[in-house]
């Protein structure tokens, strides 16, 4: 019914825009949902938290911000963080401006006459940097100085930070991060598509207004297909990878009937839709090259964690609101142990490398093959080994993959043809990306000569296409085929062990990013204006335990715990 689709789309668009109010999609009870505990409630967390400088002060977004606030109270530490910020800026500065940026860093932070000389820096190292800067401003010029600065901060300053109110506030945020996650943490919206074990729908965190995609894995369907290991593998790999070019896992929870993965919402649709349903099939070369470069960065991040993807194809590459891509659907990914190879005839016909088709052993070579196939398809408007809407038997496609070279038209420039021929090389030992240098080999190809990969990796390059914010890039609600009911499968108490491994709640870095991006951190992270300790951080003012509720109070009181508050009277309609 057309009306149902219009209503579902209208509700989703309104949610994406923040609901039209000042709260930007937040519940009217959001402060109550994110209320800090008294610091005395965080003592167990304090004792169990690993004292790792890199994790607490660099990798975790809220930890990094609070450590910077602590450093701002001491001039010598402020100089160190300013230097680190300056180096980060230097590394993403365009080539023609980098030398001037490097000279400013040398003058301000490394010269005895500079205003912000950083401590503990060997003068010989400074001299070497100055000489290298004159010869040519390479991106890693300040790498050793950066390492020494972090080493300095990780000693006495880090120890002092652990005894400060800033670290106590970090413990309060960690306490909130570790609160239980349930279906009541979210508002649910329309179905966006189907996964292997259930629907994918849009959802919104009540406390922050942040939009996500919720991938629901039906418990009975998982059990019937014996998919427990596959589902847990995807969840654990998503949890491990932190890349702007791979969808992020923010939450994992369970309901009575399903296991739920809450992932980055990609509103721009997938590359298959854009290649074939937005005018003439295929992209201009510049657009295809931009997407190939971002996919290359995503594969590099996966391979750095020794993860091979194995299912690279247009429908698994999604666009965000701004037009940047992320790799999605990690169901076939697998970890490759150091020094070992793996075996597995998995993937999608037409994108599987010859060594996969032959069931031979491999490490990361199938991903570089598939990148070549995808780049070819983006430029040519069709797959290199099968024509769209023309049925070819699987055996014939696999023969073409193993034996026949791809054909090129005049849509390919010489550089594009060169890269496309080197990536899908039949021999994995000769394939670009597999000659010992990994992603670096691919990035150094002349087709990417005009791209600054440092700026690309920082999200600083403008994409060639920006999706329409008023468009819904997916099928109509009624065109998404519904799953049939699973019969003959009963859930048993022994299944709970698997569900507990899966439903682990919030994922640290995405959750903290959510708090920062939605300005919850900015609004809640308040200290005493006159330097006084806030009541929730004051050990002297420990709260008294509230009186026990009577039976009737317990029966009729509303659940008001962090993230699980229901505020249905103010909510937008959910999926019809």
From Swiss-Prot:
Residue numbers with lipid attached (S-palmitoyl cysteine): 561-562, 565
Domain of life according to the entry: Eukaryota
Residues with Phosphoserine modification: 484, 566, 568
Compartments (UniProt record): Membrane
Catalytic activity: [G-protein-coupled receptor] + ATP = [G-protein-coupled receptor]-phosphate + ADP + H(+)
Cross-referenced Gene3D superfamilies: 6.10.250.2260, Phosphorylase Kinase, domain 1 (3.30.200.20), Regulator of G-protein Signalling 4, domain 2 (1.10.167.10), Transferase(Phosphotransferase) domain 1 (1.10.510.10)
Keywords attached to this entry: ATP-binding, Kinase, Lipoprotein, Membrane, Nucleotide-binding, Palmitate, Phosphoprotein, Serine/threonine-protein kinase, Transferase, Wnt signaling pathway
Sequence segments annotated as region (N-terminal): 1-185
Enzyme class: transferase
Post-translational modification Phosphothreonine, affected residues: 485
Residues bound to ATP: 192-200, 215, 264-270, 315-318
Molecular function, one GO term: G protein-coupled receptor kinase activity
Domain annotation RGS: ranges: 53-171
Tissue: Widely expressed. Detectable in all brain areas examined.
Listed SUPFAM superfamilies: Protein kinase-like (PK-like), Regulator of G-protein signaling, RGS
Kinase found in the keyword field: yes
GO biological process terms on file: cellular response to lipopolysaccharide; desensitization of G protein-coupled receptor signaling pathway; regulation of signal transduction; Wnt signaling pathway
Residues annotated as catalytic: 311 (proton acceptor)
Location, primary (coarse class): membrane
Quaternary structure, from the entry: Interacts with GIT1.
Family classification: Belongs to the protein kinase superfamily. AGC Ser/Thr protein kinase family. GPRK subfamily.
Protein name, UniProt field: G protein-coupled receptor kinase 6
């Amino acid at each position: 019914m057309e009306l149902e689709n219009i209503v579902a789309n209208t509700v989703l668009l309104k949610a994406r825009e923040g609901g039209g109010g000042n709260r930007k999609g937040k519940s009217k009870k959001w402060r109550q949902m994110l209320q800090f505990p008294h610091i005395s409630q965080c003592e167990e967390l304090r004792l169990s938290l690993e004292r790792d400088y890199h994790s607490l002060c660099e990798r975790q977004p809220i930890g990094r911000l609070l450590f910077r606030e602590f450093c701002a109270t001491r001039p010598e530490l402020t100089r160190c963080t300013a230097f680190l910020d300056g180096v980060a800026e230097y590394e993403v500065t365009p080539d023609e401006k980098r030398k001037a940026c490097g000279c400013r860093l040398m003058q301000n932070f490394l010269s005895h006459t500079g205003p912000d000389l950083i401590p503990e820096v060997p003068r010989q190292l400074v001299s070497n940097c100055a000489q290298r800067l004159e010869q040519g401003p390479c991106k890693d010029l300040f790498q050793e100085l950066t390492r020494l600065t972090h080493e300095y901060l990780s000693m006495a300053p880090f120890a002092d930070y652990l005894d400060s109110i800033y670290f106590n506030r970090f413990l309060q945020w960690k306490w909130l991060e570790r609160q239980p996650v349930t279906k009541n943490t979210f508002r649910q919206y329309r179905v966006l598509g189907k996964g292997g074990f259930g629907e994918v729908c849009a959802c919104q965190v009540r406390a922050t207004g942040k939009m996500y995609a919720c991938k629901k894995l039906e418990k009975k369907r998982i059990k019937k297909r014996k998919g427990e290991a596959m589902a847990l593998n995807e969840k654990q790999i998503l949890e491990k990878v932190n890349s702007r070019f791979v969808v992020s896992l923010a939450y994992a929870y369970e309901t009575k009937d399903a296991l739920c993965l809450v992932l980055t919402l990609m509103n721009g649709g997938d590359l298959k839709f854009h290649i074939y349903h937005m005018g003439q099939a295929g992209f201009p070369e510049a657009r295809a090259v931009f997407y190939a470069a971002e996919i290359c960065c995503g594969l590099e991040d996966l391979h750095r964690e020794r993860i091979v993807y194995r299912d690279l194809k247009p429908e698994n590459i999604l666009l965000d609101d701004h037009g940047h891509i992320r790799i999605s659907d990690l169901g076939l990914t697998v970890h490759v142990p150091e020094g070992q190879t793996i075996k597995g005839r998995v993937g999608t016909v037409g994108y599987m490398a010859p060594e996969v088709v032959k069931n031979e052993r491999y490490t990361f070579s199938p991903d570089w093959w598939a990148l070549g196939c995808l780049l070819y398809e983006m430029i040519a408007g069709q797959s290199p080994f099968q024509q769209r809407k023309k049925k070819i038997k699987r055996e014939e496609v696999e023969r073409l993959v193993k034996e026949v070279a791809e054909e090129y038209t005049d849509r390919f420039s010489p550089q594009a043809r060169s890269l496309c021929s080197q990536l899908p090389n039949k021999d994995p030992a000769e394939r670009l990306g597999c000659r010992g240098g990994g992603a670096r080999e691919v990035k150094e190809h002349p087709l990417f000569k005009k791209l600054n990969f440092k700026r690309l990796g920082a999200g600083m390059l403008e994409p060639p296409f920006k999706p329409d914010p008023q468009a819904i890039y997916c099928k109509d609600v009624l065109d998404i085929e519904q799953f049939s009911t699973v019969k003959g499968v009963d859930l048993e108490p022994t299944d709970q062990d698997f569900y507990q491994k899966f439903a682990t709640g919030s994922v640290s870095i995405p959750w903290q990013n959510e708090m920062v991006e939605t300005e919850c951190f900015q609004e809640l992270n308040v200290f005493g204006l006159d330097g006084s300790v806030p009541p929730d951080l004051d050990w002297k003012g420990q709260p008294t335990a509230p009186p026990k509720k009577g039976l009737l109070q317990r029966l009729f009181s509303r659940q008001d715990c962090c993230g699980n508050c229901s505020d249905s009277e103010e909510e937008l309609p959910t999926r019809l």
